[in-house]
Amino acid sequence: MKRDEKYFKGCILGGAIGDALGRPIELKKLKEIKATYGSKGINNLTLNDKGIAEITDDTQMTLFTAEGILRANCKKGRCYIPAVVYNAYLRWYSTQRNIDTKGYDECTYNSYLLKYDELYEDRGAGNTCLTSLSKEEIGSIKNPINNSKGCGGVMRVAPIGLMYNKKEAFRLGCDCAALTHGHPSGYISGGMLSCIISCIIEGMEIDEAINCAISFAKDMDGYCECVETVEKAVKLSKDDLVDTDAIRMIGEGWTSDEALAIAIYSSLKYKDDFKKALICSVNHDGDSDSTGAICGNILGAYLGIDNIPKEWIDVIELKELLENISTDLLTGYEESEEWFEKYLEN
């Protein structure tokens, strides 16, 4: 059992670090990455002029997912959890679109996260997330909001795996991804990642956690593409191939199934070395920040914060907030004025 602060922090900060590692090379081809960073690609965090490694929309949305499920927990089952998470995503959307929320519903737009200037920064927010949230219409598995399988549905759901048992995590991961992504691969991948993290926290090995997630996924309509991509990554992780060649066979990570699979490949290949796994997960032709974030979530939950390079932890943007929300996810609920101010909707 890894229901311990160091594994929760490992998951959340690990994801942010993977996100930051991949950020400078997102949209770049591997050839260009190697020309800029050397034959092994990028292998260290890029710092801004303040000495900070900046996160992207992946970590921004992960924080709002965490806030959403913590708010839902305050309601003690008297709510539809995805709807509470959806309201959290509307808060994130308001930061990205510079919306003046004065006069808006206070329950939706009152949040301590909105005090952090960094969460208003444009860090490459995905078009599907922005378009879906602009409709103010809640997507669901039964009533898909679109046919998108972009990776924006999976890259944000890791906190769900920390809060819920594996069965609930899979279901809720699917539901929360489906808020904005309507293709089966777009939301089943969210369920699988949430389930994998929940299983790891329960004490499973990574390969066991993946098998558990696959078993849940196979009960869903339209599971084939996502499961086949993940199974391909598992197989490739056991082969003696150059990592970049293996990842090229999986894809580029722009779709949810590919992003999850690349992260799974890297986590299995280097399950005892956080740094090597993250470097592997971002050096490819595609969506490097998302594959890095998901890999960081998985391996951070597995290895814990003590096995993440301290020099990376010290420079990650919003480090204190990430640590605090990790601790809150472990606590789940607390009868205190401070807790109610943070997570109880008025």
Roles of regions detected by a PLM:
Residues 1-346:
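Structured, active/binding-site neighborhoods that engage oxygen-rich ligands
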